Amino acid sequence: MAKLQAITLSGIGKNGDVTLNLNPRGVNPTNGVAALSEAGAVPALEKRVTISVSQPSRNRKNYKVQVKIQNPTSCTASGTCDPSVTRSAYADVTFSFTQYSTDEERALVRTELKALLADPMLIDAIDNLNPAYWTALLGDGSGPSPVPGPNPDPPLEPPPGTGSYTCPFRIWDLSSIYEAANSSHSWDIYNAVELSPRKFDVTLDDLLGNTDWRDWDGRLRYTTFRGSRGNGYIDLDATSLMQDEYLTSSKYLVREGKRPGAFGSIERFVYLKSINAYCSLSDITAYHSDGVVVGFWRDPSSGGAIPFDFSEFDSNKCPIQAVIVVPRL
């Protein structure tokens, strides 16, 4: 965090029409916490928005991001304010990583920081600023102008990918039967033949930061059940997919396969339609608990509610989009 850079967060607030320009305020040498604040024309309001980021070191593998918004309630049109008379809103999130910071991890921090700013308390603090603040800081006395609301009839499918993303796990073909169903198991076991890496028609940015996909229909928000990260996707829980019921049902295409060699293990694999191949559920769950099977909830009959019962998920209501590796929140 020694090389802090200015950050511009746009498209925030209830109507997505507020922009915050955050400038570095230095790093606390005691705890390594870096702070960025909004700089404005009014000195008393210069720290109206403060974002603190605790960078992981080799011995501390957590990010902690805290957003603090102080909304001045005592300001005049001339720009004089009493900074002690404020109401504040806070939100924070801690990330756990499996290794030292990477570009992808930093991208996730930026994405989830934006998701934090969608918190209702912070939206209220952003949108309901004292009018005198807008007069002093923006010079127009009115704050941001309103923009059209969300699409009342959003598309059922997520936006198409803007590029390609390589599957981070080994992929397999399970087309030939190794051992047919018998008295010991009621499902076929297949030969697992490893394939060359393949790409999804989607980029990592689409999964972590596509604002057209994020909260695409007003339902999938930062705090929604079952691992939705506010980006319009859901962690389908690779551990649950390994249960016997998924081998015998048609909810998701899960097969049991034997890896190559005399001592090759028998594992369970999930089919990834986007690349026409299978991925080992054991590989996903073993990756420091950071492997994620990505599904996209699209069941209109639910009225927008994501079910609490994982057994209600299937390939029609929540088709698999990809598998990725991201730090869990």
UniProtKB/Swiss-Prot annotation:
It is found in: Virion. Residues 145-161 have a biased composition (Pro residues). Pfam families: Levi_coat, Read-through. It comes from the Viruses. Its main location: virion. The lineage of its organism: Viruses, Riboviria, Orthornavirae, Lenarviricota, Leviviricetes. One of its GO terms (cellular component) is viral capsid. GO terms for molecular function: structural molecule activity. This protein is translated as a fusion protein by episodic readthrough of the termination codon at the end of the capsid protein. Readthrough of the terminator codon occurs between the codons for Tyr-133 and Trp-134, thereby producing the readthrough extension. InterPro entries: Levivir_coat (IPR002703), Phage_RNA-type_capsid (IPR015954), Read-through_dom (IPR031819). Residues 143-162 are annotated as: Disordered. This is Minor capsid protein A1. Minor capsid protein. It comes from Qbeta virus (strain MX1). Keywords: Capsid protein, RNA suppression of termination, Virion.
